[in-house]
Amino acid sequence: MICAPFVGVNHHWKNVLFGCAFLLDKITVSFTWLFETFLESMRNQKPNAVFTDQCQAMKNAIRVVFPDICHRLCLWHISKNAAENLPRHYGIPKFKSRFNKILFNCETESEFESSWDALLRDYNLVGNKWLSTLYENRERWCLVFSQQFLYKNESFIKE
């Protein structure tokens, strides 16, 4: 059973639980039902952005129910998924440090690109399927590719 909390941030930068549901499976139909039900409970007021893990079924449902909102990937989930998808490498402190620098601290696109390329090259990960998919979705999680969104919605800048 999957627990699906809906958490927001109030004007004091505190987490607020809007609702929670339990799903039997992780399929697009279930997530579509969940998001439509949530939207109805919020009087059809859509969120400005949605932060999720890398679940493809959830991504598909967001496209259907919230086609115009900003869908971002949660950095905490990416870090957790890295530990699961790259267990041999993520256990190496220097690799973990470099990977987390890419996730949280790159300030320019060129710094991101050079750091990413060096990490893949240095640890022989060129062609790794999980990292390739993560790179293809970099606009959804890498802050240097999200600046336009962040400046439009300053409420998402504060940590």
Which sequence ranges carry the predicted segments?
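Short Cys/His-based metal-binding microdomains
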Residues: 13-17, 77
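Generic secondary-structure boundary/loop-capping signal
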Residues: 19-20, 153
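Active-site beta-loop-alpha junctions of metal-dependent nucleic acid enzymes
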Residues: 20-42
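Conserved catalytic motifs of the protein kinase core domain
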Residues: 1-2, 47
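Secondary-structure transition/capping motifs at alpha-helix termini
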Residues: 9-14, 38-46, 65-70
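Extended amphipathic alpha-helical interaction segments
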Residues: 44, 51-54, 59-159
